[in-house]
Amino acid sequence: MNKINIGCGWRNFGDDWIHIDGGDYEHLDYNDIADLSQFEDNSMELIYASHVIEYFDREQVVPLLAEWKRVLKPYGVLRLAVPNFPVLAGLYLQKKISLEQILGPLYGKMPMAHKTIYHKTTYDFDSLKKLLGSLDFCNVRHYDWRNTEHSQFDDHSQAYIPHMDKENGT
């Protein structure tokens, strides 16, 4: 299976994955998540990007996702994880968490090489589905990280509030 982990950071999913990230990590295969020109059209079965697209504004993300779609095989899988804005807002409005507890997931401070980047937008399921539909992605649905080929890797798709409380968190 041809699989890409885009925005993998320091997480190495193993030799059967292609690792792409803008950071400086020894296990990376490539450093530019927006340019996949090294891959042929329709060559990948799975692209996984956990907490990546929110670092691009609503205009920048369109060509980014179009490039990712180009390399996906027909019926290939694009698996995205993004901060869950409705859950974060709901927990805050219900006074179950403080403002300080949602700032990290909403604004996403990430040191990268010689700069620090922050989230530029947020999504709910409907806005993400609309965006993906505009690029002809189909069968857009939620997924459970426990039922994926990368479930053993602790990444932001498994982030819960309280932080990483997988038993009691939301």
Predicted feature locations:
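Conserved class I S-adenosyl-L-methionine
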Residues: 2-9
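S-adenosyl-L-methionine-dependent methyltransferase catalytic module, highlighting the catalytic core
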Residues: 58-63, 67, 71-73, 77-170
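Local beta-strand N-terminus motif with an aromatic residue
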Residues: 44-45
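Adenosine-cofactor binding site in Rossmann-like domains, unifying the SAM/SAH pocket
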Residues: 10-41, 144-145, 153-164
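Short catalytic micro-motifs in class I SAM-dependent methyltransferases
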Residues: 51-55
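A generic secondary-structure signal marking the coil-to-beta-strand transition
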Residues: 2, 15-16, 78
